[in-house]
């Protein structure tokens, strides 16, 4: 098929992947209302077209946490990335490195930290959950620091797993899940050969290193399910600071009061995020949450955003709402599943081009120029 947009990568990924993997990344929590709103709310934001502004010196370059980025985009942490392409974390990290943006490794990656960092030149970011097993958390932080990871992305909107009904239907969970996954894999021979066979081991690299034994998909479901910690509080983040002295970003903020708490705690940044609609269905989209959060803490820390961002226009929209940078999750996984690391590179180049078109026709010569003035009737479209 011809691929010319991020939506095309989604369709290509759907063709290539066994259903349990496609629906795991494509789906959300409960009835998936928030998942839909994330995309719809962004798409409804009207950009304000301005012309004849001499845009010949346009630049997408920006700085985050003392790092220079070629554009204000980072790849989000996505669990099981290595199941979407052979050693997928390595391929995605290399693509991000070539583009000059950060790759964020998930706690529950297939490839361990130590496999990914030697493949790239720029430091990657590392994502961590609050888990009951504090020994694992300490071990993961020490290994991330030893591997040269520069920024910690601390996910706080997952004290309990979200209810993802689609997973039970697809075979990721539910009755006879292992058998259903096996049969689906056999019906997708290209994936089964390239990833299912040649992409082994399919264990949870970071967790296996700690436990000292091989882990698999069932361990992913059971170990995480029993280790998420609903007692999480700001005091837990104080404990993290004992083991991490680099930039810390709090991921999963949707309320201005929580954003203010992050400032008081001393966080270097936040990610305005509803976990891609995968946790609590019915909460507002990141786009709707952004203006109030930006008004409350803009300038006090770095504001990133994810959830619903699919293309370069969405990046510009989110920046205009108040974000300093964005993170891509599903979009890069679709590209990775469809064409491996080259697909991720192509997607990032596409987003780059889309941003340049949007900036040229809104009169924003630099990332700093992208603000509320680039939007039409923002209050009516976003805050109503």
Curated annotation (Swiss-Prot):
GO molecular function terms noted in the UniProt entry: FMN binding; L-lactate dehydrogenase activity
Entries under InterPro entries matching the protein: Aldolase_TIM (IPR013785), Alpha-hydoxy_acid_DH_FMN (IPR012133), FMN-dep_DH (IPR000262), FMN_HAD (IPR037396), FMN_hydac_DH_AS (IPR008259), LldD (IPR020920)
UniProt key word Transmembrane: no
Required cofactor(s): FMN
PROSITE patterns from the UniProt entry: FMN_HYDROXY_ACID_DH_1, FMN_HYDROXY_ACID_DH_2
Function: Catalyzes the conversion of L-lactate to pyruvate. Is coupled to the respiratory chain.
Source organism of the structure: Acinetobacter baylyi (strain ATCC 33305 / BD413 / ADP1)
GO biological process, alphabetically ordered: aerobic respiration; lactate metabolic process
UniProt keyword Flavoprotein present: yes
SUPFAM superfamilies: FMN-linked oxidoreductases
EC number: 1.1.-.-
Pfam families the UniProt entry points to: FMN_dh (PF01070)
Domain FMN hydroxy acid dehydrogenase: 1-380
Protein's cellular compartments: Cell inner membrane
Name of the encoding gene: lldD
Broad class of where this protein is predominantly found: membrane
Protein name as annotated: L-lactate dehydrogenase
Residues bound to FMN: 106, 127, 155, 251, 306-330
Membrane topology: Peripheral membrane protein
Binding-site list for substrate: 24, 129, 164, 278
Primary enzyme class: oxidoreductase
CC per GO annotation: plasma membrane
Homology family: Belongs to the FMN-dependent alpha-hydroxy acid dehydrogenase family.
Catalytic activity of the protein: (S)-lactate + A = pyruvate + AH2
Keywords linked to the UniProt accession: Cell inner membrane, Cell membrane, Flavoprotein, FMN, Membrane, Oxidoreductase
Positions annotated as active site in the UniProt record: 275
NCBIfam families on file: L_lactate_LldD (NF033901), PRK11197.1 (NF008398)
């Amino acid at each position: 098929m011809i691929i010319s947009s991020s939506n095309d990568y989604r369709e290509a990924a759907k063709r290539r992947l066994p259903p349990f993997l496609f629906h795991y990344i494509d789906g959300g929590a409960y009835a998936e209302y928030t998942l839909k709103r994330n995309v719809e709310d962004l798409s409804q934001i009207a950009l304000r077209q301005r012309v004849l502004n001499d845009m010949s010196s346009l630049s997408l370059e920006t700085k985050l946490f003392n790092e220079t980025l070629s554009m204000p985009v980072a790849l989000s942490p996505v669990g099981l990335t290595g199941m979407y392409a052979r050693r997928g974390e390595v391929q995605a990290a290399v693509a991000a490195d070539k583009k000059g943006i950060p790759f964020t490794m998930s706690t529950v990656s297939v490839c361990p930290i130590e496999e990914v960092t030697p493949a790239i030149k720029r430091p990657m970011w590392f994502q961590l959950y609050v888990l009951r097993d504090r020994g694992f958390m300490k071990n993961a932080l020490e290994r991330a620091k030893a591997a040269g990871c520069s920024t910690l992305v601390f996910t706080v909107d997952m004290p309990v797993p979200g209810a993802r009904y689609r997973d039970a239907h697809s075979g990721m969970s539910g009755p006879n899940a292992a058998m259903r996954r096996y049969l689906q894999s056999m019906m997708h021979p290209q994936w089964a050969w390239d990833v299912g066979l040649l992409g082994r081991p399919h264990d949870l690299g970071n967790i296996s290193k700690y436990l000292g034994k091989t882990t698999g998909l069932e361990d992913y479901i059971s170990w995480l399910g029993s280790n998420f910690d609903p007692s999480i509080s700001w005091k837990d983040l104080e404990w993290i600071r004992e083991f991490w002295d680099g930039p810390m970003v709090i991921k999963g903020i949707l309320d201005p009061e929580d954003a203010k708490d992050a400032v008081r705690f001393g966080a270097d940044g936040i990610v305005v995020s509803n976990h891609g609609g995968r946790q609590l269905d019915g909460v507002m989209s990141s786009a709707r949450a952004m203006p109030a959060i930006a008004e409350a803490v803009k300038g006090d820390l770095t504001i990133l955003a994810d959830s619903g961002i699919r293309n370069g226009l969405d990046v510009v929209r989110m920046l205009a709402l108040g974000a300093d940078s964005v993170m891509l999750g599903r979009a890069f996984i679709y590209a990775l599943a469809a064409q491996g690391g080259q697909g991720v590179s192509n997607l990032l180049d596409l987003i780059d081009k889309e941003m340049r078109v949007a900036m040229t026709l809104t009169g924003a010569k630099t990332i700093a120029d992208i603000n509320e003035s680039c939007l039409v009737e923002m209050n009516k479209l976003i805050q109503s």
